[in-house]
Amino acid sequence: MLTYAPVSEAGRVGKTTTAATLAASHARAGHDVLAIDMDTQNGSLTYFFGPDYDRGDPNVDNLVRHLVGRPQGEFQDLTIEVEEGIDLIPSHNMLEDLHEFLLNEKNQAENFGESYSMYHQLHRVLSEANVRDKYDVIIVDSAGKAGPI
């Protein structure tokens, strides 16, 4: 499985364009692609692919809920098929507070004498969902700032 995560702390340098182009190119080559929009600022990858999705609905299940161990449904229900061969996990407004949520989880775990790595939660969620069995390529579109993912 291939994984891409275009990263830069600067905004407007082409991360989303790169992510979308990689997704489309791999899908055209016959690969099954999972694109994950983790852009906290404006969710451009979600807007690029254009699914009907309300990123501001606080009651909808979203990736953040899964990252902090409070899912409201199955992981596969987070995905939206946006083109043949491309499933998208759309951005959600809760991503803006992801660092704080993960820090709270870390502090709570440490209070109980448990270890918790904020920086491994995306890997944990993807592993638990067995994405390797379904997808050939994963592309993560990140925000133009440093963060826990």
What does each model-found stretch correspond to?
Residues M1-I149:
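P-loop NTP-binding core
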